[in-house]
Amino acid sequence: MKTDDFDYKLPEELIASYPLENRDASRLLKLNKQTGEIADYKFTDFIDFINPGDLLVFNNSKVMLARLYGSKTTGAKLEYLIERIKNPKLFETHIKANRSPAIGSEIYVEDTLAKVLDKDGGMYLLEIQGDKDIYQLMEEFGHIPLPPYMKRDDEEFDAERYQTVYAQDLGSVAAPTAGLHFSKELMQQIKDKGVDIAYITLHVGSGTFKPVQVDDVESHKMHAEVISVPVEVCQKIRQTKENGGRVIAIGTTSVRSLETAGQNGQIEPYQGETDIFLYPGKKFNVVDAMITNFHLPKSTLIMLVSAFADKEKIIKAYEHAIAERYRFFSYGDAMFIF
């Protein structure tokens, strides 16, 4: 299976650089994965596609203000993208610099000195030397780390709009974007309809934006991300399936979390890292349907939806979305695959 099989041409003007005024005003492409039938709806119509007894599973991870700036002691400028916090004074980060900082050197993160303890590939391990911790630095100076394809600096509204309304557990470098369409009003309508809701956590890493670099899909090595699938979520899933309801994952992060916890065919609580890679030929044990945004060409996420719905059907759906001028990627429109 070739990575190029998952390529497609997207007109640049269809990349959504800004969100719509209202979260739930986006469009929704409905795809029947059995028949391949495609239909166009508004996102608010999603309420009509779910039934009492269904279970929606959301990722409640919160995006960190992970973009920070600083300098070497020489004054040379540095840009940070915080990837993972080990403890309040110890964290992993990407660093953009003309010349990479050396292991053992001291550098500034905003106004605070930090020591470079280690480097692994493009990832640095830093320890803060000053009084402030990384949470305080992000709170005081941090920027929302918008995806590179938006080609703009973050603005004030991004702090709210690049965050789901139910975000709770701080740790992501990118938003679980399928959830961005859900307004507080729509969440209430879902509850009022008798549809159950559950929350898992997957802290999205920056690797989510990276295209697959190898020619053969099977050779790709996934980046690891931290997830939590609590026992009460597993109980809800078992109950839903026993009662004939559907488990509907909101976003590929929820899909990957649930399928990690259900790898042995039976859903079990899971806490730790996952590097699960779902591509055509892989089996789904837990998820019956999903809401997802449109994904980048050659990405692991377009491979995931192709595994769920069949590659030809996904490519046709994407061609339809391009012809109908859907908006793509993080601030773009969504699909309901069932």
UniProtKB/Swiss-Prot annotation:
GO terms for biological process: queuosine biosynthetic process; tRNA wobble guanine modification. Pathway: tRNA modification; tRNA-queuosine biosynthesis. Pfam families: Queuosine_synth. Keywords: Cytoplasm, Queuosine biosynthesis, S-adenosyl-L-methionine, Transferase. Its EC number is 2.4.99.17. It catalyses: 7-aminomethyl-7-carbaguanosine(34) in tRNA + S-adenosyl-L-methionine = epoxyqueuosine(34) in tRNA + adenine + L-methionine + 2 H(+). Monomer. This is S-adenosylmethionine:tRNA ribosyltransferase-isomerase.
